[in-house]
């Protein structure tokens, strides 16, 4: 346990920041899940409206991830990893791989 006043204050600040970061990560994960579910919905029923939904959800998730990296909630490599996961899912949904020529 903290002994002096400054260390007690740092404990309080660290706890406050932990809760704020937790909430930010949670909202980021929610946006990512929305993007993945939009990709699944597009696969089920392709259309212009579904494609727009996929693009919009991806843009929102990318924005949230970039802001998390900027705020120090996520490491930049972790942010890049999450954005790559989203990009792969969206690319698979919108531009499915053509059948092999062999």
Curated annotation (Swiss-Prot):
The keyword RNA-binding applies. HAMAP family: Ribosomal_bS20. GO terms for cellular component: cytosol; small ribosomal subunit. Belongs to the bacterial ribosomal protein bS20 family. GO terms for molecular function: small ribosomal subunit rRNA binding; structural constituent of ribosome. Binds directly to 16S ribosomal RNA. Pfam families: Ribosomal_S20p. Keywords: Ribonucleoprotein, Ribosomal protein, RNA-binding, rRNA-binding. This is Small ribosomal subunit protein bS20. Coiled coil: none annotated. One of its GO terms (biological process) is translation. SUPFAM superfamilies: Ribosomal protein S20. It comes from Synechococcus sp. (strain WH7803). InterPro entries: Ribosomal_bS20, Ribosomal_bS20_sf.
